[in-house]
Regions:
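Aromatic-anchored segments of alpha-helical transmembrane domains
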Residues: 32-41, 92-100, 159-167, 203-212
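Short, Lys/Arg-rich, polar N-terminal cytosolic tail immediately upstream
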Residues: 1-20
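Membrane-interface helix caps and helix-loop-helix hairpins in membrane proteins
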Residues: 43-49, 164-172
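Alpha-helical transmembrane segments in multi-pass membrane proteins
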Residues: 18-70
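Membrane-interface helix/loop boundary segments of multi-pass membrane proteins
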Residues: 134-157, 186-193
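Functionally important transmembrane alpha-helices
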Residues: 38-40, 44, 173-231
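Hydrophobic alpha-helical transmembrane segments
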Residues: 29, 82-86, 121-125, 153-160, ...
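Juxtamembrane helix-loop-helix connectors linking adjacent transmembrane helices
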Residues: 46-50, 70-134, 145, 149, ...
Length: 234
């Protein structure tokens, strides 16, 4: 066998071995399955109990896994993450504004009772941001940034589960859940941080509840007429 043949054999061997995932990937996928099972089993209604549940299963469990095995779940803040957070939040804000005018959305939100009184809405808003942080830690942190070694395709790991978790919400929200998951995952993947999706999601939830508690900023008839092509009730 010549030196050239040896080199070719080595290159082929490297190509066969390189794509094999590390044990961390298996741990992430196993933990992800256990966590979503706990999420389905542990039902809550009020915001307080919801926060306890989500912070335990969506934040504490992935956090313990990352600490135990030295994995990365996107808990990082740097200049790139801050820039992308601002850009993503600015991009999705109009969708929340338009969505706040839809009858099905206004009938569902706020998901937890609140008013615009500062003493009531402020703690409500903090709760929403924490809910968003918990969700992003699991869906985009554990199941996207945590699977970065799989390449860009890791953004496709969680959309189906994320969409299923929106069952029972307004149909238009369920329709957009999958694409939103992919968008948020792609930005977080390229940022190496869940800050962009956390800011966009948290700010969006607060903005949506604020707008729903007020008169529509855009005439609903105009919005309904422009979106009548969508295949879901609005």
């Amino acid at each position: 066998m010549t030196a050239t043949d040896d080199t070719r054999t080595l290159v082929v061997a490297e190509r066969l071995v390189a794509p094999l995932p590390t044990p961390w990937v298996g741990r992430v996928l196993a933990a992800g399955a256990v966590i979503i099972a706990l999420r389905l089993w542990w039902s809550t209604s009020a915001l307080g109990p919801r926060l306890v549940r989500d912070l335990v299963i969506f934040v504490a469990l992935p956090g313990l896994l990352a600490v135990r095995y030295g994995g990365d779940i996107g808990w990082r803040v740097d200049r790139t993450a801050v820039r992308n957070a601002a850009l993503l939040a600015a991009f999705v804000a109009p969708f929340y504004v338009v969505g706040s005018t839809l009858p099905t959305v206004r009938a569902y939100y706020p998901a937890w009772r609140t008013t615009l009184a500062l003493g009531e809405f402020l703690p409500h808003a903090v709760g929403l941001v924490l809910v968003a942080f918990a969700a992003e830690t699991y869906y985009r942190g554990l199941l996207c940034v945590g699977l970065r070694e799989l390449g860009p395709g890791c953004v496709l790991v969680s959309p189906v589960v994320y969409a299923l978790m929106h069952t029972g919400k307004p149909p238009v929200e369920l329709l957009l859940a999958g694409p939103t998951d992919v968008l948020f995952g792609a930005v977080d993947y390229n940022s190496g941080s869940i800050l962009p999706s956390t800011v966009a999601h948290g700010a969006g939830l607060v903005l949506l509840d604020y707008l729903v508690l007020r008169d529509p900023v855009i005439p609903p008839d105009r919005v309904l007429a422009s979106l009548r092509w969508l295949p879901v009730p609005l």
